[in-house]
Every structure is written in structure tokens, then in C-alpha cells.
């Protein structure tokens, strides 16, 4: 995985520099859509087929996305470069790194919230608001439910983890009692 990240980083950074000259959100949508298409085994199979030209593969990728940015010369050049260098499989990692650069520029971060119970809109908004104050940045939450937490939440923002779950507290108490 680290090797993929190392190879994908220059592509993501170059694409981000191009996106800074225009609409970063639209470019983000494009790269996310391309990543979804590149995850399809059928697309990877077609891309590696000797019967299909590289130009045809690039056209296939661009035809599969809805983003209006795909019609631009920069997007076409980017996709053609990936196809020519046999880097289509890197698109999911490029999308991840592009999103990280976008978040860094916006002063935002992705927050993975794991809750013992489903969170409704008001509860989630209140939780995110409090977390934004704690982490001092805008958060983009994704929520999962894990009943094994028993109660509370576990929040991961980048490499920081805030675990207020009952399971974590019980583990802490067990460690203190057995020490």
C-alpha cells in the first residue's frame, strides 16, 4: 500500500495544481468518479487488453464519468498520461491523496465516527459541532454503527483517535484493576 501511495502522490499533486486554477470541487468529483470506474475489474481487463488502443482506453474512462470537467483538455491529458504509463489502477489512491490535499487547503479533515447506536440528524450535527471545536477544523463525517462499543462513540480524525465508548472505558478499568 505504501508503494502505491508513493507512486500516486506526484499524480495527485500535479492534478491538484491544475485544479487550483479552476474549480477544485469539480476536479474532486472527476477524480472520485474516475477512481470508481478504475475499481471495476472489467475496466482493468479492457485496459490491459492488447486489442484495445491506449486512446480507446482513455476515451472509455472519460465517457464513463459525468463530470463536466472531463470534457476539458487538462482532464483528457491527465487520463491519457495515466493510460500511457499503465497507472489506471492507481486512480483510487490518487483520488484519496487528492482529497487529502483538498481538505488541507480548506482546513478540513475527514472524520470517521463509529457509534454504538444510529445517530439522527440533530445528534450528529451536535456531535460534529463539538468535535470541530475540539479538533479546531471543519470535519467531513462518515458514520458507522458498531454495537460492540456498548455505548458512546469512537472518532478518528487523521491519526488522532477520541474513544469515549463504554467498551474503551471498561478496558481501561480492567487494566487499572489488574495492574
From Swiss-Prot:
Q: Which SUPFAM superfamilies match?
A: N-terminal domain of the delta subunit of the F1F0-ATP synthase (SSF47928)
Q: Which residue ranges run through the membrane?
A: none
Q: Name one GO cellular component term.
A: proton-transporting ATP synthase complex
| Topology term for the membrane | Peripheral membrane protein
InterPro entries, per database record: ATP_synth_OSCP/delta_N_sf, ATPase_OSCP/dsu
Write the record's keywords in alphabetical order, separated by commas: ATP synthesis, Cell inner membrane, Cell membrane, CF(1), Hydrogen ion transport, Ion transport, Membrane, Transport
**UniProt KW Transferase keyword:** no
**Where is the major localization of this protein?**
membrane
Q: Which Pfam families does this UniProt record tie to the protein?
A: OSCP (PF00213)
Gene Ontology MF annotations: proton-transporting ATP synthase activity, rotational mechanism
| Primary role | F(1)F(0) ATP synthase produces ATP from ADP in the presence of a proton or sodium gradient. F-type ATPases consist of two structural domains, F(1) containing the extramembraneous catalytic core and F(0) containing the membrane proton channel, linked together by a central stalk and a peripheral stalk. During catalysis, ATP synthesis in the catalytic domain of F(1) is coupled via a rotary mechanism of the central stalk subunits to proton translocation. This protein is part of the stalk that links CF(0) to CF(1). It either transmits conformational changes from CF(0) to CF(1) or is implicated in proton conduction.
Q: What HAMAP family is this protein classified in?
A: ATP_synth_delta_bact (MF_01416)
Assembly notes = F-type ATPases have 2 components, F(1) - the catalytic core - and F(0) - the membrane proton channel. F(1) has five subunits: alpha(3), beta(3), gamma(1), delta(1), epsilon(1). F(0) has three main subunits: a(1), b(2) and c(10-14). The alpha and beta chains form an alternating ring which encloses part of the gamma chain. F(1) is attached to F(0) by a central stalk formed by the gamma and epsilon chains, while a peripheral stalk is formed by the delta and b chains.
Q: What is this protein called?
A: ATP synthase subunit delta
Amino acid at each position: 500500500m505504501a508503494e502505491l501511495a508513493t507512486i500516486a502522490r506526484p499524480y495527485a499533486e500535479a492534478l491538484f495544481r491544475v485544479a487550483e486554477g479552476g474549480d477544485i470541487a469539480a476536479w474532486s468529483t472527476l477524480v472520485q468518479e474516475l477512481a470508481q470506474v478504475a475499481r471495476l475489474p472489467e475496466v482493468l481487463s479492457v485496459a490491459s487488453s492488447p486489442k484495445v488502443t491506449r486512446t480507446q482506453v482513455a476515451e472509455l474512462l472519460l465517457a464513463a464519468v459525468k463530470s463536466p470537467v472531463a470534457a476539458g483538455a487538462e482532464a483528457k491529458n491527465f487520463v491519457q498520461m495515466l493510460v500511457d504509463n499503465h497507472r489506471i489502477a492507481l486512480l483510487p489512491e490518487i483520488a484519496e491523496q487528492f482529497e487529502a490535499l483538498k481538505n488541507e487547503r480548506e482546513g478540513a479533515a475527514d472524520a470517521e465516527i463509529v457509534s454504538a447506536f444510529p445517530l439522527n440528524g440533530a445528534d450528529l450535527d451536535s456531535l460534529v459541532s463539538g468535535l470541530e471545536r475540539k479538533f479546531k477544523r471543519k470535519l467531513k463525517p462518515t458514520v458507522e454503527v458498531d454495537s460492540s462499543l456498548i455505548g458512546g462513540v469512537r472518532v478518528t480524525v487523521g491519526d488522532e483517535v477520541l474513544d469515549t465508548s463504554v467498551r474503551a472505558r471498561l478496558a481501561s478499568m480492567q487494566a487499572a484493576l489488574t495492574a
